[in-house]
């Protein structure tokens, strides 16, 4: 026997309802189901306070929820069998740590769905938020099995730390799709944001639309046709140890990335040339700040520099200093010609100067937010100088 749940009223305080699971309902009568405990804030209350619950003659181990549960979290968390159908929008952490069964949503869902799931299927006939199939914060191992199907769009950090399983997105995806991916497969039929596959070491990502930017840690391998589209396979992320990640992108929709520009064909605007900025810690930087002091001349010498490809360095007139600008902020840095840098990209050691340029993007933590950022690069004028760490803190309020 199945059950139908209908919210009695709007939820004023978010509800944590991990007891809404077909395998937990099995064998219980209506009174026992109504008595199952949920959390309203930090207070335990019976499920029956919030939902009208009735039996239905439909298939066994079926729960149908009719109504808006966008402020209800953990529905289907850890479920092992059965089916949940939700006719309405759903809140955070739907189906997290799910091991089996099926969840279908006729509406939109919030973030963290299928987090660290092991098996089963989640189907969303609408849009989804961030962190689909990802790992908990502080963990590196995300989705380990199962399948997530999203017919609409999805947000940032899809499949973060994914180990196995499948994620299908019928629409667009946000930034850092497949970040730190270790296995499994992600398919995006629409467009994706910047830096797909950041720090991936294994797994497959297929993006059939346009991507905002491609990290320099991906190497082009081959071209082939799939479903009538010309696709290109890249291997990466080469910034990781022994990477075996496969990133497929649509050739015709990504000519802005795939067509190698020449220095003669690039245009210097008033802002400068548009490049992709990447950052990371260096060994020397670590040695300098080991004692916690970032206010030394050595620190400025190491971190207030911009590594530029020979082509771009020549295009800018072989400058001594450059100005890098992003989202309204700009810094002056010492220009360093580096043959290890790809044309159209720059590298700045992670420090206060890099922090000024990094967008205030908080959906990701750690190094990936310092990767694949579009910035402008120009030759510094005679009156523009490199600011000290103290001056940057005072001007921009960035932390040390």
Swiss-Prot record:
Keyword Transferase: no
Upregulation: By growth on molybdenum, under anaerobic conditions.
Pathway info: One-carbon metabolism; methanogenesis from CO(2); 5,10-methenyl-5,6,7,8-tetrahydromethanopterin from CO(2): step 1/3
Matches recorded under CDD domains: FwdC/FmdC, MopB_CT_FmdC-FwdD
Regulation of activity: Inactivated by cyanide.
Pfam families with a match to the protein in the record: Molydop_binding
Domain of life of the organism encoding this protein: Archaea
Alphabetized InterPro entries for the sequence: Asp_de-COase-like_dom_sf, FmdC/FwdD_MopB-bd, Formylmethanofuran_DH_csu/dsu, Formylmethanofuran_DH_suC, Glu_synth_asu_C_sf, MoPterin_dinucl-bd_dom
One BP annotation, GO: methanogenesis, from carbon dioxide
EC code(s) of this entry: 1.2.7.12
Job description of the protein: Catalyzes the reversible oxidation of CO(2) and methanofuran (MFR) to N-formylmethanofuran (CHO-MFR). Can only oxidize formylmethanofuran. This enzyme is oxygen-labile.
Homology family: In the N-terminal section; belongs to the FwdC/FmdC family. In the C-terminal section; belongs to the molybdenum dinucleotide binding protein family.
Subunit structure of this chain's protein: Consists of five subunits; FmdA, FmdB, FmdC, FmdD, and FmdE.
UniProt name for this protein: Molybdenum-containing formylmethanofuran dehydrogenase 1 subunit C
Lineage: Archaea, Methanobacteriati, Methanobacteriota, Methanomada group, Methanobacteria
């Amino acid at each position: 026997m199945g059950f139908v749940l209908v919210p009695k009223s709007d939820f004023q305080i978010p509800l944590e309802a991990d007891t809404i699971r077909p395998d937990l309902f099995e064998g219980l009568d209506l009174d026992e189901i109504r008595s199952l405990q949920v959390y309203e804030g930090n207070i335990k209350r019976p499920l029956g306070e919030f939902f009208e619950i009735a039996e239905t003659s439909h298939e066994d181990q079926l729960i149908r929820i009719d109504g808006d549960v966008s402020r209800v979290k953990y529905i289907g968390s850890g479920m092992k069998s059965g089916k949940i159908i939700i006719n309405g929008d759903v809140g955070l952490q739907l189906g997290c740590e799910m091991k089996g069964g099926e969840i279908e949503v006729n509406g939109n869902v919030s973030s963290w769905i299928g987090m660290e799931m092991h098996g089963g299927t989640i189907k969303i006939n609408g849009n989804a938020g961030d962190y689909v199939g990802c790992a908990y914060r502080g963990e590196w191992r995300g989705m380990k099995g199962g399948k997530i199907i999203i017919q609409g769009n999805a947000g940032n950090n899809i499949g973060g730390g994914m180990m196995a399983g499948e994620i299908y997105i019928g629409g667009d995806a946000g930034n850092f799709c497949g970040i730190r991916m270790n296995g499994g497969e992600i398919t995006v039929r629409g467009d994706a944001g910047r830096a797909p596959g950041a720090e991936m070491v294994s797994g497959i990502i297929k993006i059939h639309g346009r991507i905002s930017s491609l990290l320099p840690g991906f190497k082009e391998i081959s071209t082939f046709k799939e479903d009538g589209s010309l696709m290109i396979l890249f291997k990466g992320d080469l910034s990781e140890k022994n990477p075996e990640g496969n990133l497929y992108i649509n050739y015709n929709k990504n000519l802005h990335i795939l067509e190698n520009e020449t220095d003669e064909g690039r245009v210097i605007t008033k802002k400068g040339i548009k490049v992709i900025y990447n950052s990371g810690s260096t060994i020397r930087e670590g040695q300098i700040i080991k004692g916690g002091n970032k206010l030394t001349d050595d620190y400025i010498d190491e971190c207030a520099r911009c590594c530029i490809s020979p082509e771009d360095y020549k295009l800018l007139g072989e400058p001594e200093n450059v100005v890098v600008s992003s989202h309204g902020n700009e810094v002056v840095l010492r220009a360093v010609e580096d043959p290890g840098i790809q044309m159209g990209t720059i590298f700045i050691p992670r420090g206060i100067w890099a922090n000024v340029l990094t967008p205030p993007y908080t959906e990701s933590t750690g190094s990936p937010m310092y990767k694949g950022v579009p910035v402008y690069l120009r030759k510094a004028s005679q009156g523009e100088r490199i600011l000290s760490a103290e001056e940057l803190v005072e001007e921009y309020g960035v932390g040390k």
